[in-house]
C-alpha cells in the first residue's frame, strides 16, 4: 500500500496538506499532542534500562577441553586463568602505588571519634607513615625478606593498613591475630609463626601477651607496639620479663630518623599468613602470596569492569575483620583504584551511625547482617496494610530484577525503600556478600530494596577469599555464580554421599593463581587440602546449574552415619531449618548407634513471641522456650520446611530441645568466623542430647 493510500484509508490528509490539517486543529488538541510527545520522549530517555551483562547469562562458564570436566569463566578468551588485570600491579605494594597516582594524592584512610566527622589521611601521608614503620622495623633488626613475620593484633583501624603497607614496602609478611581467637589459639599462632614483634591496638592485648611471656608460653616474643595510650606500669611489666613495650608514635619517629629505601616484594613472595579458625584443633596458617591476592582482586575487577569501575570517588566502610581474606581483598581493590576507606568506631552497635556519617558507596557484608536487616524491615511492617504495601513494592522491584534492572529511583523506592537506603548512608552502589550461605529469599528482597549492584561470592581462605562470583546482570539467587576469571573449578566424586561428577555434582575443587601455597609448617594438612596436581579440595559439595553457575548443596567434612548406614550432612539440614520464622540457630546431631536425628534449637528472640501469639501461645521468651506445645509447633514448622526442601525422612529431626541462649564466640560454641564448633556443641548439650534419645521412641 502506498503512503497516500494509507492516509486516505485512515481518512487523514496527505503530507502536502498536513500543514493545513494541523492549522485546523484546536489549540488544546495541539497542546495535548505536544505534552504527549514530551512525556514519551522523557520516558524513552529516562526509562529503566537493564544492566548489560558481560557475557551470555545462559552460559556463564565453559568446560575446558581435556581437564576432566573443569570449567572456566566465560569472560576469558582462552583457557588460561587471569593473573593480573593491570600490567603495573603484580604485588600489593604496586597496587598501593597505583592508588597514590590515580587518586592524585586524595584521601585514603579515615576514622572518627564518637559524634565527630571522619578525619582523613591522604595517600601520600599513608605511604610516608608506612615507610616510617617499615624503616623502624629494620632499625629494630628485622629482615627485609619474605620469611620475616610481623604480628598484627588489632581491630580494623588506619594503623592496621599503615603497618601492612609498611611490611609490604620492605618484603615482610604480616600475621593477623583475631580479636576473638582465645588465649590458647593466640599463644599457638605466636609460637607457630615465631613472632618476636606484635602490634596491638589496646593495652589489654599487650597485657594478654605479657601474661603469656611471664608464664613461659610464648618465650620468643620480644617487642610489643601499642597503638593506644598506656601507662608506665605496662612498660615496667614488660621490662621484668624481657619484653620491650613501645608506642606506635615512637616507631614512626624511629623510622623517620632512619629512613630506608623500600625493598618491594616479588609476586611469588608471601604477603600474609592467614590463620583459619578450625572447628576442631589448632588454627592452620594459610600461606598467601602477593600473586594470590592480586589475581583474586584482578578477577573481581575483570568480572565487573563494565559495571562497577571502582574509582577515587568511592568510599568503603571497613568493619568486617581485616584478619579475614574477604575484607582484605575488598580493601586491596579499593586501594588499587585510589578510593577512600573509612573505618567503623570499633563497636558494631554504632555501625549504623558510622554508615550515616561516612555515606559509603561500597558495603561488603556477611549473611548474618543481611538476616538482621531483613528481619528489622519486616518487623517494622507491623500492620496488615504496611505488610501488604511492603510485599507489593518488593514484588514490583523483584520483577525489575528479573529483567536485569537495578535502580533506587523508582516510585517504590521513594515511597517504601528510601528509609532503609538512607540508613546505609544513601549512596551505596555496590554490595558483596560472602563467608557463609545466604538465603535466596533474603538476598532477592535486599537486592530489590537497596537498589544497588549486589553480588554474592563463594570461596575460602585457601583460595584467597573468592573463587566464584555472581555475574553482573544476573540477579537471580540460589547460586554462587560462575568461576572467577582467576581460577578453574571442577567437581569430583564423593561416592559415600552418592555425588557423582558425571551427573554434575561433587566436591568443589579449585585451581589457579589464587590458590594458596599450603599451611605453615604443616605438610600433612597441606597434603589433605592440595592434591599433587595443585587442586584445592574445599570440602564443599557443589552442583553445576544449566547456565554454568555453581550451587553449593552440601558439606563433606561434617558427614556422619546413622545406625542404618545412611550418611548425614548436618549443615545442609541446619541451613534449611533456619528458614523457619521462629528459629535463630540450629544444631543437628546424630550418632552411629542411633537411628534418627535430634536438634538443639535457639529461638529468635525478636520473632518468637509474635509468632507464638499468632498461634495462641502467651508468655515471655523464656516461658515460651519451656512450653512443650511451642516446642511441638516449632518442630512441625521445621519438618514442613524440610519436606518442602526435599529432605529425606531419615534427614528430618525427630525431636528438639529449645535453648534460650544464642551460640556465640563468647560461650565457645562458634568460631570467630561464626561457624559452629560441633564437638563443643556436642559436649555442651550432652545431657539434653541423652534426654532426647532416651525419651523419643521411633
Curated annotation (Swiss-Prot):
Q: In which domain of life is the source organism classified? A: Eukaryota
- Give one GO term, molecular function aspect: pristanate-CoA ligase activity
Q: Which InterPro entries match?
A: AMP-binding_CS, AMP-dep_synth/lig_dom, ANL_N_sf, LC-FACS_euk
Question: What's its EC?
Answer: 6.2.1.3, 6.2.1.15, 6.2.1.24
Which cofactor names does the annotation list?
Answer: Mg(2+)
List the keywords (alphabetical): Acetylation, ATP-binding, Endoplasmic reticulum, Fatty acid metabolism, Glycoprotein, Ligase, Lipid metabolism, Magnesium, Membrane, Microsome, Mitochondrion, Mitochondrion outer membrane, Nitration, Nucleotide-binding, Peroxisome, Phosphoprotein, Signal-anchor, Transmembrane, Transmembrane helix
Reactions catalysed according to its record: a long-chain fatty acid + ATP + CoA = a long-chain fatty acyl-CoA + AMP + diphosphate; (5Z,8Z,11Z,14Z)-eicosatetraenoate + ATP + CoA = (5Z,8Z,11Z,14Z)-eicosatetraenoyl-CoA + AMP + diphosphate; 3,7,11,15-tetramethylhexadecanoate + ATP + CoA = phytanoyl-CoA + AMP + diphosphate; hexadecanoate + ATP + CoA = hexadecanoyl-CoA + AMP + diphosphate
Mark the residues carrying the PTM N6-acetyllysine: 207, 356, 386, 632
Q: Which residues carry this modification: N-acetylmethionine?
A: 1
Residues bearing PTM Phosphotyrosine: 84
Q: What regulates this protein's activity?
A: Inhibited at high temperature and by arachidonate.
**In which family does this protein belong, per the annotation?**
Belongs to the ATP-dependent AMP-binding enzyme family.
Please tell me whether the keyword Ubl conjugation is annotated for this protein: no
Gene transcribed to yield this protein:
ACSL1
Q: Which organism is it from?
A: Homo sapiens
What is this protein's name?
Long-chain-fatty-acid--CoA ligase 1
The membrane topology noted for this protein in its Swiss-Prot or TrEMBL record is: Single-pass type III membrane protein
> What are the annotated glycosylation sites?
135
Regions of this protein lying in the Cytoplasmic compartment: 46-698
Q: Its Gene Ontology biological processes?
A: adiponectin-activated signaling pathway; fatty acid biosynthetic process; fatty acid transport; linoleic acid metabolic process; lipid biosynthetic process; long-chain fatty acid import into cell; long-chain fatty acid metabolic process; long-chain fatty-acyl-CoA biosynthetic process
Q: Which GO terms describe its cellular component?
A: endoplasmic reticulum; endoplasmic reticulum membrane; membrane; mitochondrial outer membrane; mitochondrion; peroxisomal membrane
Give residue numbers for the modification (3'-nitrotyrosine): 9
Where does this polypeptide localize?
Mitochondrion outer membrane; Peroxisome membrane; Microsome membrane; Endoplasmic reticulum membrane
Q: Which residues carry this modification: Phosphoserine?
A: 620
Tissue note:
Highly expressed in liver, heart, skeletal muscle, kidney and erythroid cells, and to a lesser extent in brain, lung, placenta and pancreas.
| SUPFAM superfamilies with a match to the protein in the record | Acetyl-CoA synthetase-like
Amino acid at each position: 500500500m502506498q503512503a497516500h493510500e494509507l492516509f486516505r484509508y485512515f481518512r487523514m490528509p496527505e503530507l502536502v496538506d498536513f500543514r493545513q490539517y494541523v492549522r485546523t486543529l484546536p489549540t488544546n488538541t495541539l497542546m495535548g499532542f505536544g505534552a504527549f510527545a514530551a512525556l514519551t520522549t522523557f520516558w524513552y530517555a529516562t526509562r529503566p534500562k537493564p544492566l548489560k551483562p558481560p557475557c551470555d547469562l545462559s552460559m556463564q562458564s565453559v568446560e575446558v577441553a581435556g581437564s576432566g570436566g573443569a570449567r572456566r569463566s566465560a569472560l576469558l578468551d582462552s583457557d588460561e586463568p587471569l593473573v593480573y588485570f593491570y600490567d603495573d600491579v603484580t604485588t600489593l605494594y604496586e597496587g598501593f602505588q597505583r592508588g597514590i597516582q590515580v587518586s592524585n594524592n586524595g584521601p585514603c584512610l579515615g576514622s572518627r571519634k564518637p559524634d565527630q566527622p571522619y578525619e582523613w589521611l591522604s595517600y601520600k601521608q599513608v605511604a610516608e607513615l608506612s615507610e616510617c614503620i617499615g624503616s623502624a622495623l629494620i632499625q629494630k633488626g628485622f629482615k627485609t625478606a619474605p620469611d620475616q613475620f610481623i604480628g598484627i593484633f588489632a581491630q580494623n583501624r588506619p594503623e592496621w593498613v599503615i603497618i601492612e603497607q609498611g611490611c609490604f614496602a620492605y618484603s615482610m609478611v604480616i600475621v593477623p591475630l583475631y580479636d576473638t581467637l582465645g588465649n590458647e589459639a593466640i599463644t599457638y599462632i605466636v609460637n607457630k609463626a615465631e613472632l618476636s614483634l606484635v602490634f596491638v591496638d589496646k593495652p589489654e592485648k599487650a597485657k594478654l601477651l605479657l601474661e603469656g611471656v611471664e608464664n613461659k608460653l610464648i618465650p620468643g616474643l620480644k617487642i610489643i607496639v601499642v597503638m593506644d595510650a598506656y601507662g608506665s606500669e605496662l612498660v615496667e611489666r614488660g621490662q621484668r620479663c624481657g619484653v620491650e613495650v613501645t608506642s606506635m608514635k615512637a616507631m614512626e619517629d624511629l623510622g623517620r630518623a632512619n629512613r630506608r629505601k623500600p625493598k618491594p616484594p616479588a609476586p611469588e613472595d608471601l604477603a600474609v599468613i592467614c590463620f583459619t579458625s578450625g572447628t576442631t584443633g589448632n588454627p592452620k596458617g594459610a600461606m598467601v602470596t602477593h600473586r594470590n591476592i592480586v589475581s583474586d582482586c584482578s578477577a573481581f575487577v575483570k568480572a565487573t569492569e563494565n559495571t562497577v569501575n571502582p574509582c577515587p570517588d568511592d568510599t568503603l566502610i571497613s568493619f568486617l575483620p581485616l584478619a579475614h581474606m574477604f575484607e582484605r581483598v575488598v580493601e586491596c581493590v579499593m586501594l588499587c583504584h585510589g578510593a577512600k576507606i573509612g573505618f567503623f568506631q570499633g563497636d558494631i552497635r554504632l555501625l549504623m551511625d558510622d554508615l550515616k556519617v561516612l555515606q559509603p558507596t561500597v558495603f561488603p557484608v556477611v549473611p548474618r547482617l543481611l538476616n538482621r536487616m531483613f528481619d528489622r524491615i519486616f518487623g517494622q511492617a507491623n500492620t496488615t496494610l504496611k505488610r501488604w504495601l511492603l510485599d507489593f513494592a518488593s514484588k514490583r522491584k523483584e520483577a525489575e530484577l528479573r529483567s536485569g534492572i537495578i535502580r533506587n529511583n523508582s516510585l517504590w523506592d521513594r515511597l517504601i525503600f528510601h528509609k532503609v537506603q538512607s540508613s546505609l548512608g544513601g549512596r551505596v552502589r555496590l554490595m558483596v556478600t560472602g563467608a557463609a550461605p545466604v538465603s535466596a529469599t533474603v538476598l532477592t528482597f535486599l537486592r530489590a530494596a537497596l537498589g544497588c549492584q549486589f553480588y554474592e561470592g563463594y570461596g575460602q581462605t585457601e583460595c584467597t577469599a573468592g573463587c566464584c562470583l555472581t555475574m553482573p546482570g544476573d540477579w537471580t539467587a540460589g547460586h554462587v555464580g560462575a568461576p572467577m576469571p582467576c581460577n578453574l573449578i571442577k567437581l569430583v566424586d564423593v561416592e559415600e554421599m552418592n555425588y557423582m561428577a558425571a551427573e554434575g555434582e561433587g566436591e568443589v575443587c579449585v585451581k589457579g593463581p589464587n590458590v594458596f601455597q599450603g599451611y605453615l609448617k604443616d605438610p600433612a594438612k597441606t597434603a589433605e587440602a592440595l592434591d599433587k596436581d595443585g587442586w584445592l579440595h574445599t570440602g564443599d559439595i557443589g552442583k553445576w546449574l544449566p547456565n554454568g553457575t555453581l550451587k553449593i548443596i552440601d558439606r563433606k567434612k561434617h558427614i556422619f552415619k546413622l545406625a542404618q548406614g545412611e550418611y548425614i550432612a548436618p549443615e545442609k539440614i541446619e541451613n534449611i531449618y533456619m528458614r523457619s520464622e521462629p528459629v535463630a540457630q540450629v544444631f543437628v546431631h546424630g550418632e552411629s548407634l542411633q537411628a534418627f536425628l535430634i536438634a538443639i534449637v535457639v529461638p529468635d528472640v525478636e520473632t518468637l513471641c509474635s509468632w507464638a501469639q499468632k498461634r495462641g501461645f502467651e508468655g515471655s521468651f523464656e516461658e515460651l522456650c519451656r512450653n512443650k506445645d511451642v516446642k511441638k509447633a516449632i518442630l512441625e514448622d521445621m519438618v514442613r520446611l524440610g519436606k518442602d526442601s526435599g529432605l529425606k525422612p531419615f534427614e528430618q529431626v525427630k525431636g528438639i530441645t529449645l535453648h534460650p541462649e544464642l551460640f556465640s564466640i563468647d560461650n565457645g560454641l562458634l568460631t570467630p568466623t561464626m561457624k559452629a564448633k560441633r564437638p563443643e556443641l556436642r559436649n555442651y548439650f550432652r545431657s539434653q542430647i541423652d534426654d532426647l534419645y532416651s525419651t523419643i521412641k521411633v
